[in-house]
């Protein structure tokens, strides 16, 4: 495998359509989660966001081995009933929960390919030490979604919570001490215009798709 297309937080936007255009020229497509709950200032209706989500589910079903759908904090709020994220869609809650429930087998919380680890918000050492003290990063990547659910709603003060660090769906990019056994790729923290790409991790939540070349390690935007 050499090229992975990455679609960060969608929130009802259409930029992910680039993945449909390029599906035959990449080896894998990884969505980083957060498909719904659009931002009001972007003038995307909640119903339009649901339609985009339905298209993404169809895209996954049409390309089951090539498309990876990760769960974000907004998605987990509908999937696991442990609280609501900002802009939670109470009006269409039943429909959204049914979509997730019917298709939950299509989603996961992390994806690893070689030396690259994809999650919605990234893995910090503090989170592993505090909430999964018996697990290092290698053992973490053996855990199932069901096993990880109890530890997802850890939110730090940077996101309005009272935990010392956020989970893999809640960690803010400002939370340091990133686990660096694998090169981490995540979204969650919306950035103004440019991604943050370091030699240890990349935060790509800038409303566009990216292409990762596994052979060279280069990450570039393609939208």
What do the predicted segments below correspond to?
Residues 7, 12-99:
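Core catalytic region of metal-dependent phosphoesterases/phosphodiesterases
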Residues 1-2, 24-27, 64-66, 114, ...:
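A general structural motif
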Residues 90-91, 95, 108-178:
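Active-site-proximal loop/helix segment associated with metal-binding centers of metalloenzymes
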Residues 6-8, 29-34, 68-73, 118-119, ...:
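Active-site neighborhood of phospho(di)ester-bond hydrolases with catalytic His/Asp-centered motifs
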Residues 167-222:
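Conserved beta-sheet core of the metallophosphoesterase superfamily
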Residues 93-105, 200-204:
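Short, solvent-exposed secondary-structure boundary motifs
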Residues 1-5, 111-117, 198-199:
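Beta-strand-turn-beta hairpins that frame and shape the catalytic cleft
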